[in-house]
Amino acid sequence: MLEGWSVVIDYTASSRPFGMARLLTRYGFRVDRIYADTISPEEEDTIAFLKERCPHILVCPTVHHKMAVLPRGLYEESGGRVLAIGQKAAYFTGTPHFVNMVEDGGLYGCGGILELAGLMQEAAMEEKDTGKLIQVKGWGCFC
């Protein structure tokens, strides 16, 4: 279902975004970006794993001032096959295909992994109205 899709993850979706990336890459998903401003000491081994086995993954800050003006073209560049996990990842890539999840969404263990897989499949099949779901968070609101 998600073969050929690029997956991007942000730190608001998971307390351990690098661990999520490791899990997904081990099961054949192509994770291309992780949006995170800090790296938890608990994830140092995971970072080493990703550097060795997935050197193509970009780690992008979300609070850097240039992030507000960078083009959001990954979605178009990838032929519309970008799946984001988290609202910030959806915003920065411009994709309408995203898992709208915050702080792991209550998912845990094997059941949580299976539920995440279902949410990813659902996000790939159905576009969300990104502008409505991600309102004031830098979307260009003139409030």
Predicted features and spans:
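An N-terminal assembly and electron-transfer interface module characteristic of large anaerobic redox
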Residues: 1-143
